Each structure stands twice: as C-alpha cells, then as structure tokens.
Amino acid sequence: MKNEKIDMSRESDTFHVSQDGVYTITGTNSRHGITVSAGVRATIFLQDVNLCDLGDMGVAFHIAENCHITVILEGNNILHSGREMAAIQLRKQSVLNIKGN
C-alpha cells in the first residue's frame, strides 16, 4: 500500500493515482489535475488544493471504473474543470466518499 505526499505546484502533468494507498495532495496547478486508475482503492487528502484543467474537455479530478475512493478535505480546496466537464468525474461502479471539516 502506497503512502505518498504530492505538491501539485511541482507537477508538470496530470498526477496519476495508480496504486491502492493513502495520498496527501497540496498546492496549486492551473493546467493539470488528478486521475485515479481503474480498480484503485485509496484515501486522498486534499489540503488547500487549487486545481484547474480548463481545456474544453479538461477534468480536475477523474476517477475511473471500479474504484473505491475516500476524499478528505482539509482547508480551502478548489477544483475547476473545462466548460464541458464537471470538476469531479466518477465512472461506472465506482464509489466516492467525501469528508471534511
């Protein structure tokens, strides 16, 4: 099980959650978001995150099929996607739980 901390302000591409585990994500990125690969079970802490993927089909937070994801919000978090897309996209047979203060 992976335990990783990611500063999105240092990422030059979309961050891919491809393994089960716990991820803590911080920072601002005006070009890239987060993608969770199919079948992943993870807890993702968003700590004062500001993510924008403003391409016409851009998605700030994409969760593929058959995932079980818990997102825990800490601080102020902003997710913004392109004009045609929701900020968080959840595919078939995935479960998303969102918790926060």
Residue ranges and their predicted role:
Residues M1-N101:
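A composition-driven surface/loop motif
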